[in-house]
Amino acid sequence: MTNSSIFYVFYGLIQGITEFIPISSSGHLNILEILFKNLESRNYLYETSAHFASLLALLLYLFTNKHFSKSNIKAYWKILIYATVPAIILGLILKIYDVSYINLELIGYTTIAGAILLYVSDKAKKIKLKIKKKSTKFILAGFFQCLAFLPGFSRAGSCIIAFRLFGESRKNSSIYSLYMGIPIICLSFFSNIKEFENFIVDKNLTLIFITTFFAAYFTITVFIKVINKIGFTPFVIYRILLGLILLIYLS
């Protein structure tokens, strides 16, 4: 297997494993690209393929595990649209002004900051916010989700932090973060759909799609099954260690 193939296998595995748990897929992928010195030749076709595979894995999980029903779809689709508006607005602003801030030092700090907020939201019972309406919770979580524009913070993590602050269980917070991932991943996919014009399926594209799909489905299944038992502390510890390693490496 060539170095190029190894890179894309790792890319798919990292995307699939990290997309739906609170450790940041973008942060890990940026680290991978920097380590492989591949930022210059970034291929948005492969990135879009990975997002599509993640989306398919997520939808398959939700449908096969009966998280989606006619009543659920009817209850949530409008809420999810409203909850996604803050991310759409901020994303457009960043795109218009071509704001880019990929660097390992920032990823180190945001990884640690996200870990602290995740720990506080999970453990501090006294600061739980009493919000009864589920629609309000989702819309407020949409603002938290904007933290994910900081590389290393984690989209799933920002949503879980919000729902834990709103008093939801670990499992429900994690499932709601999956729901909120649907429109975001769809937007990410369709924003780069032009990359598929006149594309040719090659080995690397296939590697990314397959590894992302199976890694994502497996990770979601295990994560939702065990999260009430293990809690978020293992993710907090991992994030702090990763952040410290990055900052020490750069010092």
Regions found by a protein language model. Name each.
Residues 1-251:
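Multi-pass membrane proteins that catalyze or facilitate reactions on polyprenyl-/lipid-phosphate substrates
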